């Protein structure tokens, strides 16, 4: 199979979905234990953190203004880089302010990426194939989440990996995936 066969917009959507889901699922599944065990969060701080996580969702409309400056596909890459960096550095900031900042960066990347991914999907896919491919993207995200949860469980249960190392590996894989897709796909 030649690389040219793999270089299409659907595969770009698939790979970006995997990268996003891997990073976000890692962040979500480790967060509650990390903030309690390492940052000594109470319910109050967890509530503030979750509220901060939703702020970029409210600001997703600003995508329109950002797209006046850069192309959508490039913005998708930038958003995934923000997500990857936010996840990668989360473990190094076990304080309220540090976690609030890393959460905002991660969440901004996540919300902007999801907004742009939906837009790109609807532009790139024909009306006949859109329902099937969008369904496959959702299924791929679910499968990626399950695989991520399994590897996190194995890495902590059998190998005693720290929260920090898991966050770093997950964020790094996201960043490598973005680099790969940026360099090899349309």
Describe the predicted segments one by one:
Residues 92-102:
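Helix-loop junctions at membrane interfaces in 12-TM secondary transporters
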Residues 165-179:
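Symmetry-related core transmembrane helices of the 12-TM Major Facilitator Superfamily/SLC fold
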Residues 64-69, 147-162:
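Transmembrane alpha-helix termini and helix-breaking/packing motifs in multi-pass membrane transporters
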Residues 8-53, 57:
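Helix-loop boundary and gating motifs at the non-cytosolic
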Residues 135-150:
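Glycine-rich segments within core transmembrane alpha-helices of 12-TM secondary carriers
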Residues 81-94:
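C-terminal ends and interior cores of transmembrane alpha-helices
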Residues 181-186:
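Conserved small/polar residues in nucleotide/adenosyl-binding loops
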Residues 112-125:
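Intracellular juxtamembrane helix-capping segments at the cytosolic ends
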């Amino acid at each position: 199979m030649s690389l040219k066969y793999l270089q299409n917009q659907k595969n770009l959507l698939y790979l970006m979905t995997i990268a996003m889901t891997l990073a976000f699922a890692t962040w979500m599944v480790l967060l509650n234990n990390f903030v309690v065990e390492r940052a000594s969060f109470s319910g109050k701080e967890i509530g503030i953190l979750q509220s901060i996580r939703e702020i970029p969702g409210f600001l997703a409309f600003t995508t329109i203004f950002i797209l006046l400056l850069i192309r959508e596909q490039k913005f998708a890459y930038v958003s995934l880089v923000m997500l990857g960096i936010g996840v990668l550095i989360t473990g190094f900031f076990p304080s309220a302010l540090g976690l609030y900042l890393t959460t905002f960066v991660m969440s901004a990347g996540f919300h902007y990426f999801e907004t742009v991914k939906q837009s790109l999907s609807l532009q790139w896919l024909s009306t006949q194939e859109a329902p099937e491919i969008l369904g496959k993207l959702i299924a791929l995200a679910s499968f990626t989440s399950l695989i991520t949860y399994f590897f996190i469980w194995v890495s902590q249960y059998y190998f005693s990996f720290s929260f920090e190392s898991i966050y770093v590996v997950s964020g790094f894989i996201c960043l490598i995936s973005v680099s790969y897709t940026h360099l090899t796909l349309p």
